[in-house]
């Protein structure tokens, strides 16, 4: 009897994401086992249970997916799982907490592609402002932008101290330089907007972080990209279906939540399929997701 493809879904939360379960099933996993309230200290034991119970041949048909809501903890869990294995007992690993790794990758790839319509340098040397940037998608998108050569600001509506704390913590974990910013007051937010080449709306669903009045201040803005699909739009004037569409009243191109979401979906699907089909075990995190997002966009062009 041929061994089934098994995916173990691990989360520190109280439930796994139905989105991730559906994506795993559609990628061809035949058995999907959820594990909740998983702490970092439990990762080694769970990983070794998964690898030793199937032998080297069964390991090739076994995967571990790390979810949750904490992008830093997910990275630590992924690393702990990787270090808990040794040849020939190795399985494939993939972290995507709350879809943030693949969403951030899609957001950055779409932004980069839009920028390159105007400047071949893309994100390199650009000042990127992430409004709502202390959340899951904002932190990861900030790291990816910084790795591409951008000067990154994670803005918080709770003030500069909050933004700087998130920037320092995230930058330290992933080896990049990020800066904090405040969007707490109109004056603070508009000062940041006036200096930004790229503005990303990465706040919670249904929260507008750039108004029409704010937009008028952002005269340097080349791309406005929003991941909020719930009205009102996170960045005023950016429609959910916009895909590098001129943003009224500005010289910028607009990228909406569904344009990003379509790429995100394809990225997660492809990575799960590649994980299942891999001849040798793979470990996927957000830099890998950005590579796949660029592939998706290259196929569209």
What are these model-predicted stretches?
Residues 1-88, 288-301:
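N-terminal ligand-binding/catalytic initiation module
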Residues 2-3, 230-301:
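Adenosine-phosphate binding glycine-rich loop
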Residues 38-41, 72-76, 102, 106, ...:
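Conserved active-site and cofactor/substrate-binding residues in soluble primary-metabolism enzymes
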Residues 86-94, 124, 248-251:
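Glycine/charged-rich beta-loop-alpha catalytic/anionic-binding loops adjacent to active sites
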Residues 94-113:
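A glycine-rich, Thr/Ser-enriched phosphate-binding loop motif common to dinucleotide/cofactor-binding enzymes
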Residues 104, 135-141, 163-164, 207-210, ...:
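Short glycine/serine/threonine-rich phosphate/pyrophosphate-binding segments
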Residues 113-198:
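Glycine-rich phosphate/diphosphate-binding loop of Rossmann-like nucleotide-binding domains
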Residues 176-254:
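Rossmann-like adenosine-cofactor binding region
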């Amino acid at each position: 009897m041929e061994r089934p493809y098994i995916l173990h879904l691990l989360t520190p939360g109280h439930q796994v994401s139905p989105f991730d379960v559906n994506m795993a099933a559609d990628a061809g996993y035949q058995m999907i086992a959820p594990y909740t309230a998983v702490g970092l200290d439990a990762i080694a034991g769970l990983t070794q249970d998964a690898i030793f119970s199937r032998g080297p041949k069964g390991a090739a048909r076994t995967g571990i997916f790390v979810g949750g809501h904490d992008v830093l903890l997910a990275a630590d869990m992924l690393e702990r799982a990787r270090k808990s294995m040794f040849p020939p007992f190795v399985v494939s690993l993939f972290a995507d907490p709350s879809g943030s790794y693949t969403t951030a990758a899609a957001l950055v790839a779409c932004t980069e592609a839009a920028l390159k319509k105007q400047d071949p340098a893309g994100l390199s040397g650009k000042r990127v402002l992430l409004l709502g940037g202390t959340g899951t998608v904002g932190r990861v998108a900030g790291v990816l932008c910084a790795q591409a050569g951008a000067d990154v600001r994670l803005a918080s509506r709770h003030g500069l101290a909050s933004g700087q704390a998130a920037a320092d913590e995230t930058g330290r974990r992933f080896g990049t330089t990020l800066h904090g910013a405040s969007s707490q007051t109109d004056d603070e937010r508009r000062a940041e907007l006036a200096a930004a080449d790229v503005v990303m709306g990465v706040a919670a669903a249904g929260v507008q972080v750039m108004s029409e009045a704010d937009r008028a201040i952002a005269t340097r803005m080349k791309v406005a990209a929003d991941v909020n699909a719930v009205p009102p739009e996170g960045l005023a004037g950016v429609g959910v279906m916009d895909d590098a569409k001129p943003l009224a009243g500005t010289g910028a191109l607009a990228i909406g939540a569904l344009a990003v979401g379509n790429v995100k979906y394809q990225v997660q699907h492809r990575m799960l399929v590649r994980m299942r089909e891999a001849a040798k075990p793979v470990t996927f995190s957000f830099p890998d997701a950005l590579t796949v997002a660029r592939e998706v966009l290259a196929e569209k062009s």
